[in-house]
Swiss-Prot record:
Recorded GO CC terms: cytosol
Reactions that this protein is recorded to catalyse: (2R)-3-phosphoglycerate + ATP = (2R)-3-phospho-glyceroyl phosphate + ADP
UniProt protein name: Phosphoglycerate kinase
Keyword Oxidoreductase appears in the UniProt entry: no
UniProt lineage: Bacteria, Bacillati, Mycoplasmatota, Mollicutes, Acholeplasmatales
BP-aspect Gene Ontology terms: gluconeogenesis; glycolytic process
InterPro entries: Phosphoglycerate_kinase (IPR001576), Phosphoglycerate_kinase_CS (IPR015911), Phosphoglycerate_kinase_N (IPR015824), Phosphoglycerate_kinase_sf (IPR036043)
GO MF terms held by the record: ADP binding; ATP binding; phosphoglycerate kinase activity
Keywords per UniProt: ATP-binding, Cytoplasm, Glycolysis, Kinase, Nucleotide-binding, Transferase
EC number: 2.7.2.3
Pfam families hit by this protein: PGK
Family membership noted in the UniProt record: Belongs to the phosphoglycerate kinase family.
């Protein structure tokens, strides 16, 4: 059993904190800092306990030397300093004398941010392939390892599994503990009825989680791009809507299975002739979609249908928007579901998966009304699917 952070002796210790600070950037400006806010409880606790905190995180996809100019963690370090209201040190390197010296000069309560761990992916992918020498080196910088990056717990990287392999004293941060606690409520001990909502564009991304959820949920509401492949599998015309034709046999199998009766598909759609915010929108029944239009949102009948299921739920888990919420006229379905779920009884456990569904909830200003909003998109789905989670498993081993 992994120790709790509050039971660790961290005063005056060098604590390696793996955080998920992979925030979206536009022209080197952070457009959504919720992942930074999410680690503040752990970070503030470490500072209050007078630990010497050394933060590791990745940012973006770094495949070439040129990419490095766009994905420095310096802008993230500045935002952390703002929220902590204290100075911290940013080291623009991932290893070497400058980093070694900076760590050696730290005082209790100091915070240091190491450069983007994915800089080590150029050119040999040392971070992403969990290079043992890199993991061993990073581990040598600290006394204690705190993993608070749930968003990477489904990955085997040098900055999570690698460090954990070479350091004895380790634990999860408060964020990861919270993520695991809420996800176990779905997987192990849900209050029923348990209603899941799955959206997003591709059914192929979620076949595994659909199979897993059908064993656990009472109702599975499916919307978004993936619903059109489901309709096509039932031999309905979907016009020019998104289709994964190669997944039709799999979807037919799921719909025909004993658990398939738990699946509820949309009854109508808001469609347009083009994937554009200005295309003319019109509502079509699921069995009467024209050849020249594509579905871009669930329709008003479906909103009401989904509401009836959600309003009876004791546990709700939602991953993936049910429409193109970035376009105003195709955002009504996603917004209506977000409002419905956020207005459920405080006794109802409501959990939002990471990624676009979380982005939608924040966009609509409803983020305070959910029991939990996960910081991990892929990790969230893989946990629900029951896949191995290397970033969690490695914390149990000495």
């Amino acid at each position: 059993m992994t120790k709790s952070l509050t039971n660790m002796n961290i005063t005056n210790k060098k604590v390696l904190l793996r955080a998920d600070l992979n925030v979206p950037l536009e022209n080197s400006v952070i457009t959504d800092d919720n992942r930074i806010k999410a680690i503040l409880p752990t970070l503030k606790y470490l500072v209050q306990q007078k630990a010497k905190v050394i933060i590791f995180s990745h940012l973006g996809r770094v495949k070439t030397e040129a990419d490095k100019a766009h994905f420095s963690l310096q802008v993230v370090a500045e935002k952390i300093a703002f929220y902590l209201q204290q100075k911290l040190k940013f080291v623009p390197e991932t290893q070497g004398n400058t980093l070694n010296q900076a760590v050696g000069q730290m005082l209790p309560g100091d915070v240091l941010v190491v450069q983007n761990t994915r800089f080590e992916d150029v050119p040999f992918k040392k971070e992403s392939k969990n290079d043992p020498e890199l993991g061993k080196y990073w581990a040598s910088l600290g006394d204690v390892f705190v993993n608070d990056a749930f968003g990477t717990c489904h990955r085997t990287h040098a900055s999570n599994v690698g460090i954990a392999t070479y350091i004895k004293e380790k634990c999860f941060g408060f964020l990861v503990e919270k993520e695991i606690s809420f996800l176990k409520k779905i997987v192990q001990t849900p209050q029923r009825p348990l209603v899941a909502v799955l959206g997003g564009s591709k059914v192929s991304d979620k076949i595994g989680v659909i199979r897993s959820l059908l064993q656990k949920v009472d109702v599975l509401l499916i919307g978004g791009g993936m619903s059109y492949t489901c309709l096509k599998a039932k031999c309905f015309n979907i016009g020019t809507s998104l289709l994964e034709a190669d997944k039709i046999p799999l979807v037919k199998e799921l719909l025909a299975s004993p658990e398939g009766k738990k699946i509820v598909l949309p009854k109508d759609f808001v469609c347009g002739k083009e994937f554009s915010p200005t295309t003319q929108a019109a509502v079509y029944s699921y069995d009467n979609i024209s050849d020249d239009v594509m579905g871009l949102d669930i329709g008003p009948q479906t909103i009401e249908l989904f509401k009836t299921y959600l309003q009876t739920a004791q546990t709700v888990v939602w991953n993936g928007p049910v429409g193109v919420f970035e376009f105003e006229q195709f955002s009504k379905g996603t917004k209506a579901l977000a409002e419905t779920i956020s207005n459920l009884s405080p006794n109802t456990t409501t959990i939002i998966g990471g990624g676009d569904s979380a982005a939608a909830v924040f966009k609509f200003g409803l983020d305070q009304n959910f029991s939990h909003i996960s910081t991990g998109g892929g990790a969230f789905l893989e946990f629900l699917e029951g896949k191995p989670m290397p970033g969690l498993a490695c914390m149990e081993k000495l």
